[in-house]
């Protein structure tokens, strides 16, 4: 199952089930010193959402490929570079007809989904002159030239697209967090402008008080340090801190027993530290900031420990990290409340962008209002013309009656009264 771990861990899917043929590595610990250790029931663990717009397609393709014995055996021996380079994609030519048929169907469904997205985009832009094929080429995780067949090119493109997109995923999350904080500050300042001086001072005072309350928390251990891991060992694992053993710790927290600590398994180690700073019940604690803090901690530990940069921590890498001086005597960890997310210049630039966007929206709203008013004017004009027409018809009918001429029917034919 190592191929699946490598591929999906690298792509952040982190599928945590093993092939039934593989057995978990036994954990060598003194059972007399372990408290409250309960056997974990076997269960299918759903892979987390990668955040990619083709996440479901990626998962389905991997699930189908896993059912082919030949392909699975080839990939069990693969390393990350072989998977990333696309050399293994050629093995797709040897999978069973049944598997290829399923992959073909998945691709047709994905192409159909993308075309629906494009249609929705075109409808929203009302740009009939836009080239559909050019839009389709924006999606680089499949081969558009053959929309009905899943080929080795498709697998190669899917792996490379996921690898590239997810390598930039953390950076994108940091940028989105920064925008979130700037928007928060922008909205706070805009709200203050609506208040009188007395109310404004009250709000400013409350804001400063909330900041102080949030900053008043226990010391946060440096992520990945001995103190931090020992705290997890004692409080989460229920073990004696004097018996702390890095090798045992690694095996305890390698939840799926695949020989690696993946990003989700690492992030789980920081929960106790984050709970010192963030409480969802407290008004002053922002849970969005907590997730940013978790991401920063994980990135820091990965940079320090993951020497081959494959986004996975092996037991060897983990043990080497525990031999470093920084493991025993780390620098103090600066939490987000000790940092400035943006400068005044950056906030000003962001507010200018918001103002431009608001102006564009206002222009569109004004245009729509004008169109609505014009349509209403035309409607009223048509109604007036209809009324005038009916009045003229009625006057003509009355005049004919006065002259003794039979009234005409809807088609202009004369109506005669039957003689009895």
UniProtKB/Swiss-Prot annotation:
Keywords: Calcium, Cleavage on pair of basic residues, Cytoplasm, DNA-binding, Endoplasmic reticulum, Golgi apparatus, Guanine-nucleotide releasing factor, Membrane, Metal-binding, Nucleus, Phosphoprotein, Repeat, Secreted, Signal
Positions of the UniProt region annotated as Binds to necdin: 213-420
Positions occupied by motif GBA: 304-334
Gene Ontology terms: biological process: small GTPase-mediated signal transduction
Binding residues for Ca(2+) 1: 254, 256, 258, 265
Binding-site list for Ca(2+) 2: 306, 308, 310, 317
Main location: Golgi
InterPro entries registered for this protein in UniProt: EF-hand-dom_pair, EF_Hand_1_Ca_BS, EF_hand_dom, Nucleobindin
Disordered: annotated segments: 195-225, 398-420
Signal sequence bounds: 1-24
Highest taxon above the source species: Eukaryota
EF-hand domain sequence ranges: 241-276, 293-328
Compositionally biased tracts (Basic and acidic residues): 195-212
Location in or out of the cell: Golgi apparatus; Membrane; Cytoplasm; Secreted
Chain positions found as Phosphoserine: 257, 332
Anything else known: NEFA stands for N=DNA-binding; EF=EF-hand; A=Acidic region.
Its biological purpose: Calcium-binding protein which may have a role in calcium homeostasis. Acts as a non-receptor guanine nucleotide exchange factor which binds to and activates guanine nucleotide-binding protein (G-protein) alpha subunit GNAI3.
Protein name: Nucleobindin-2
Lineage: Eukaryota, Metazoa, Chordata, Craniata, Vertebrata
